Amino acid sequence: MCIRDRTRPARRPVRRIALIAAAAVLVLAVGTAGATGILRSAAEVFSPLFGGAPAQTEIIDKIGYPVGASDTDNGVTVTADAVMGDAYNAVIVYTISRDDGTRLLPEDITGEMLLVHGNGTDLSILGGSHGSSYFVVEDPAASSIQMVETVSADKPINDCTATGVFENLYKWDEEAGEAVPIIEGKWRLKFEMTYEDSSVTLSGGETFTQDGMTFTIDSITLSPVAYKVDYTVDSEVVWSNSGSGRQSEEDRLTTQRYFENVEILLTLTDGTVIDLSNAGGSIGPEDGVTVCSKGEVFSEVLPMEDMASISVGGVVYDLTVE
């Protein structure tokens, strides 16, 4: 068996990777249109990143949405190339390019050192959200790079207006322990999250027990690009509110009991098991119980017909039954 890791009032977000502060880089053969005004297809944008097999490309063509919105400052243009997702999750690909065609990154900079400030992609929804970002560098000497941003929310996001706000591109100086600006500028671009939602929702009601508590699975939303699991715990979470600005040991253990220890496994028809437990989400006390949401975007497009089952806390849902 192969196991892989993928990725209200007083409601507490649980983040796996800080939005826009990622330091991961993928070295891929990904072409970029830069600021040429070319509107690239969703498949052209996403296939090199999330899978280029025929079944994956077919899905991307169906649910992806080319954007092309851009903003320029200080000779550098940020373009939102395309977006795809489902009702509660989305992935946006941005291109950062130097308008004169010269090298974007200094010679001593590598992709894993990059980060950008700003608010990231704001969806202006009345609900909680979490996400991550990383940079894609095909050629360190090129005039452009890509940034991939994922967003997951507890409210529908596939029919809203997004505003991307970014300020300065930085390198992380490990020796100094601080971010140093390498490209200065402020970019603001607005676009519609108009993509097709291909998700299915599995009705809940099943329960499981662990850590001395009973968990009720409220619903599971699953699509070729992401997942979301909503569940309710039969006791109300209590936070220490230490006021230090850092998570206390007590709160860390509480987060584990209510959230991190909830195992989510996706089994594919070929027998592969994907561990989805290490996800972001939210934990919220509510009238004697705790309402939780857990989910994120997959690392690659997964056709629904390739999914055999999904389990939450040991409760198995058969995905092959029509």
Model regions: which residues?
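Conserved small/polar residues in nucleotide/adenosyl-binding loops
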Residues: 1-5
